[in-house]
Amino acid sequence: MKKFISISICTLYSVFCTLLMAQSLLTPEQLAKRERHKNLTVKEWNTDEKTQTRWLDRIKVYDNQGRCVEEIEYATYGQKWRVTSKYDDKTGKVIEEVEYNDRNRATRIKKYEWNENGTKAKQYNYLPNGKLFSIKVYEYIFSDK
């Protein structure tokens, strides 16, 4: 019985520390913004000055944690592009983005690796067939100036 309790406490502590670390990577402003965006859909509209014709310009969809999971850009003829995002449950950081064209076909898949301090480390760019296209490495240089 004692072993079970100590494992449970250890597991709970580990989960608590992981959540605390993930939350500490976000600034208070970022946390407040996420809170305001929970389960939100934002539609942006444009209006032609001469004809007063109105059309949908952009849609952003946020999940129950306030993270943008889909963004769609429109033109007068319809969808220009769309991006969907997936997030790591532990850190809350985006781990994958899929870009779609005006015909709603995937054109690029981006997968991300993050440094322990919450900054991007690498971005892997894949073609729709799954073939690795390129790798972007992020370098952060701080100056004393």
List where the protein language model places each region.
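Buried hydrophobic residues that stabilize the cores of well-folded domains
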Residues: Q23-K145
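Short amphipathic alpha-helical "recognition" segments used for binding
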Residues: S6-I7, K120
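Positively charged n-region of N-terminal signal peptides that target proteins for export
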Residues: M1-F4
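Bacterial N-terminal signal peptides
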Residues: S8-T18
